[in-house]
A protein has these predicted regions:
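Extracellular beta-sheet/turn segments enriched in Thr/Pro/Gly and aliphatic residues
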Residues: 95-136
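Tryptophan-paired
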Residues: 49-90
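C-terminal motif of bacterial Sec signal peptides marking the signal peptidase cleavage site
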Residues: 17-20
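Bacterial signal peptide processing site
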Residues: 22-24
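Short, hydrophobic/aromatic beta-strand segments
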Residues: 45-49, 96-97
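Bacterial N-terminal signal peptides that target proteins for export
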Residues: 1-9
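Asparagine-centered strand-capping/turn motif at beta-strand->loop junctions
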Residues: 32-43
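Sec-dependent N-terminal signal peptides
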Residues: 9-15
Length: 136
């Protein structure tokens, strides 16, 4: 009889552990595009965004003032890789800087996002994610 009580107790504990626990996977940001916006008053040239680890890159030769250059790509989960951005100003100055592209704290995991590099002037930029207006 004591064996059955112990068995019953252990069985109940096992059920509580198995069915009482919940998997907590954090949602991932899905990225399917990149855009270089030029809000500066001069042309930005030879823009190149490089993933440091793999040396893969995306580039755009010329972005006129108040316009953009963008591309789409197959959707991928954002993994926070180290990125480096380089570009040339209309005066010929070549600038290279690391990019801090943070995943938003709140986002809709059912939507696809585009990474945005927005030049605020010829020598500075902001980097962020926005919902991809063309999520195909």
């Amino acid at each position: 009889m004591l064996f059955y009580k112990r068995f019953y107790f252990m069985f109940c504990c096992l059920l509580i552990v198995l069915f009482g626990c919940k998997s907590t996977t954090s949602p991932t940001l899905t990225v399917s595009g990149l855009a270089f916006y030029n809000d500066a008053n001069s042309t930005i040239e030879n823009i190149k965004l490089t993933v440091v680890e793999s040396a893969k890159m995306v580039s755009c030769n010329l972005v006129e003032p108040q316009s953009y250059c963008g591309t789409g790509f197959p959707q991928a989960r954002y993994q926070g890789a180290d990125l480096v951005l380089s570009w040339q100003t209309s005066q010929g100055q070549i600038i290279t800087r690391p990019v801090l592209l943070k995943q938003p704290q709140k986002f809709d995991a059912s939507k696809r996002y585009a990474a945005v590099i927005k030049f605020t002037d010829p020598t500075n930029f902001e980097a962020f994610f926005t919902v991809n207006p063309r999520p195909f």
